[in-house]
Curated annotation (Swiss-Prot):
<feature type="glycosylation site" description="N-linked (GlcNAc...) asparagine">
    <location>
        <position position="594"/>
    </location>
</feature>
<keyword id="KW-0443">Lipid metabolism</keyword>
<feature type="glycosylation site" description="N-linked (GlcNAc...) asparagine">
    <location>
        <position position="387"/>
    </location>
</feature>
<feature type="glycosylation site" description="N-linked (GlcNAc...) asparagine">
    <location>
        <position position="122"/>
    </location>
</feature>
<feature type="glycosylation site" description="N-linked (GlcNAc...) asparagine">
    <location>
        <position position="50"/>
    </location>
</feature>
<feature type="glycosylation site" description="N-linked (GlcNAc...) asparagine">
    <location>
        <position position="56"/>
    </location>
</feature>
<feature type="glycosylation site" description="N-linked (GlcNAc...) asparagine">
    <location>
        <position position="606"/>
    </location>
</feature>
<keyword id="KW-1003">Cell membrane</keyword>
<keyword id="KW-0472">Membrane</keyword>
<protein>
    <recommendedName>
        <fullName>Phospholipase B</fullName>
        <ecNumber>3.1.1.5</ecNumber>
    </recommendedName>
</protein>
<dbReference type="GO" id="GO:0046475">
    <property type="term" value="P:glycerophospholipid catabolic process"/>
</dbReference>
<dbReference type="InterPro" id="IPR016035">
    <property type="entry name" value="Acyl_Trfase/lysoPLipase"/>
</dbReference>
<feature type="glycosylation site" description="N-linked (GlcNAc...) asparagine">
    <location>
        <position position="272"/>
    </location>
</feature>
<feature type="glycosylation site" description="N-linked (GlcNAc...) asparagine">
    <location>
        <position position="528"/>
    </location>
</feature>
<dbReference type="GO" id="GO:0005829">
    <property type="term" value="C:cytosol"/>
</dbReference>
<keyword id="KW-0442">Lipid degradation</keyword>
<dbReference type="GO" id="GO:0005576">
    <property type="term" value="C:extracellular region"/>
</dbReference>
Length: 637
């Protein structure tokens, strides 16, 4: 990094890390900026008289979401009929409500998750030949978290293009996410200009603003990237993306979690923390609180940032706070997790330097995302956040719920089936072990204590049970005969053709590597076209709830599928051996059950360690980047 760039980086990040926002936005500069609709910063508008500023979660779906899902259902129904007919299966008596959920895990999760999505797209020749392509057109909801939120943002904002096309024609993920290869001073100048404009209006800024703008400049449409007009809001997506305007894509949901501070000053991200969701229509939560849960509420996301007291605006209204890049950055605020990454570094000097930097950020709350609290003084008798100025949000994966299942488990949404793509870093070799599902199951038991806050999560095994049963190496159906919950089709990342166990903190990918990640993610869903019965069984699982099937009345074909792919309720809690799958191999369970054909034998050596080597390199890359960032902040040992 050049001296000039480092100096400017210092100015930028020092401003962000140590700025203290005023209690309410300043508006004296607004006249100079006009509407500001080409800027990252929010802009002032007249307060509308026909807006419901706070909607209690117990009232069901918001009007915008309800209208979208109704329009979506009309498009989904003929797709379901066509896909079922192609498998020789009966058309369900009602249209199933299907969701997909993409886990967190940085670029690894974005690429692997979008690969899984590609496995459901007819536009992919390989997915079409594997006979799972086409099902995405039958999906109503799409939820993303952290790296999965990047997948959500790039896919939705680009109108649902094939991910390999986005890689070839748009993404520049071969350039480091925070420290671009070209090292242009303009990158930092633009970051400073955009974030400073937001700060000048009195809104809180933090590293999340910079993080989000950087993400957007790598994966959002070029016209909305930092060097052009970084002003794409979440609420504007249905009006600027025709495929969302006419409900041709699933409705997107991005989630984050709140962070609390204990009396002793310890920063806490609890597994039972409030889960917040962003949609093109609303921001809010279905359940407020951590230790005690009460019914949550929602506010129109278009006016997020407006100061509201007990359901009424305080005279000044704002638009533009819901920048899509900011929402994506909020869902992927990984800085707390960086502490975990430091434990494996070899340099004590490096560790001390970055730890000091992160500790300062944590103390000043610059490593979280601050949202002006629209729910201030609302329902103060039951609302645990009624007296907060800001809602403080972090990466929801830090609750260990690294798959955004909860929004799709809410009874009001009536979701029938969820395809859950898991790219979590759970094991020593950066593969999933079911922690995300198990954590959500345990959380669901707490939420079920109150009727108005419950979510409908089927039972799943322990983490040891996932590994010992091989459930973390191939798709598994959960909740097969529990018709009170959605059926979950769990799709873990597995090295079918590539060592996809790269580090969460790998901030750049060469295009060839990214392409292999996408293809491997697709094959984790299609099973590399190696199991002839899989497309039929996948169809059975997606539509089962709409038939109200159980083992007593399910069709012979689908029951045979469920006998094969459903979790049988076993849970071997014995400590498993180290999980280290072999690249280019078939999951042992598929071989043992004589399900797979036409796949080459695994190589003699375990090449998945290449992924570990890649993770080590990634760790070095991000460490050097953090050193430069810390140096820019002028931190000294």
């Amino acid at each position: 990094m050049s001296i000039a760039t480092a100096t400017f980086a210092f100015s930028l990040f020092a401003t962000i890390a140590f700025a203290v926002p005023p209690e309410t936005p300043r508006i004296e500069l607004q006249a100079e900026r006009g509407l500001g609709d080409k800027s990252y910063a929010p802009w002032q508008v007249d307060c509308p008289s026909n807006v419901t500023w706070i909607r209690n979660a117990t009232t069901g779906l918001g009007s915008g979401e309800r209208a979208y899902i109704e329009a979506r259902e009309k498009l989904v129904q003929p797709v379901i009929e066509q896909m079922m007919a192609a498998r020789g299966l009966e058309t369900p008596p009602r249209t199933p409500n299907i969701g997909v959920a993409l886990s967190g895990g940085g670029y690894r999760a974005m690429l692997t998750g979008l690969g899984g999505i590609m496995g459901m797209m007819n536009e992919s020749t390989e997915a079409s030949e594997s006979e799972t392509g086409g099902w995405l057109d039958g999906v109503s909801y799409w939820a993303g978290l952290s790296g999965g939120s990047w997948a959500t943002g790039t896919f939705m904002s680009n109108g649902g293009q094939l991910p390999t096309n986005l890689l070839e024609n748009l993404w520049n993920i071969d350039s480091n996410l925070v420290f671009p290869d070209d090292d242009k001073l303009s990158f930092y100048t633009e970051l400073y200009t955009e974030t400073n404009a937001k700060s000048d209006l009195g809104f809180p800024i933090q590293i999340t603003d910079v993080w989000g703008l950087a993400i957007g400049s790598h994966v959002l449409p070029e016209r909305y990237q930092l060097s052009n007009t970084p002003n794409l809001t979440f609420s504007s997506l249905p009006s600027v993306v025709s495929a969302l305007g006419n409900a041709s894509l699933p409705m997107p949901i991005i989630i984050a979690a709140d962070r609390k501070r204990r009396e002793a000053g310890e920063l806490v991200i609890a597994e039972n923390a409030t889960v917040w969701e962003f949609t093109p229509y609303e921001f809010g939560s279905w359940a407020f609180g951590s230790q005690y849960k009460s019914p949550g509420a929602f506010t129109p996301i278009e006016y997020l940032g407006t100061s509201v007291d007990d359901g009424s605006p305080n005279g000044t209204c704002w638009k533009g706070f819901d920048q899509l890049s900011f929402v994506m950055g909020t869902s992927a605020t990984l800085f707390n997790g960086a502490f975990l990454e430091l434990n494996g570094t070899d340099s004590g000097l490096l560790t001390n330097l970055i730890t000091a930097f992160l500790a300062d950020l944590g103390e000043d709350q610059a490593d979280i995302s601050r949202i002006p609290n629209t729910f201030s003084n609302y329902n103060s008798g039951e609302n645990p956040i009624y007296n907060l100025t800001y809602i403080t949000l972090v990466d929801a994966g830090e609750t260990n719920q690294n798959i955004p299942l909860e929004p799709l488990l809410v009874p009001t949404r009536d979701v029938d089936a969820i395809v859950a793509f898991d790219s979590s870093y759970d094991t020593d070799y950066i593969w999933p072990n079911g922690t995300a599902l198990r954590t959500t199951y345990e959380r669901a038991k707490v939420l079920a204590e109150h009727e108005n806050t419950r979510v409908l999560m089927p039972e799943v095994p322990s983490m040891n049970g996932f590994v010992n049963g091989g459930y973390n190496s191939r798709p598994t159906f959960f909740g097969c005969n529990d018709t009170t919950t959605p059926l979950i089709i769990y799709v873990p990342s597995y090295p079918w053709s590539f060592a996809a166990n790269t580090s969460t903190y790998q901030l750049s990918y060469e295009n060839d590597e990214a392409n292999e990640m996408l293809l491997n993610g697709m094959r984790s869903l299609t099973l590399n076209h190696s199991v002839p019965t899989w497309p039929t069984c996948f169809a059975c699982a997606l539509t089962d709830r709409s038939f109200m099937y159980t083992s007593e009345n399910r069709s012979t074909t689908c029951q045979k599928c469920f006998d094969t792919w459903c979790w049988a309720g076993d849970d071997n809690t014995t400590e498993p051996a180290t999980y280290e799958p072999v690249i280019n191999s078939v999951p042992p369970w598929l071989v043992a059950n004589n399900l797979s054909i036409g796949v080459a034998d695994a190589p003699a050596s375990n090449e998945s360690t290449a992924g570990t080597a890649s993770s080590g390199a990634a760790k070095a890359d991000v460490s050097m980047g953090m050193v430069a960032l810390a140096a820019g902040l002028g931190l000294m040992l």
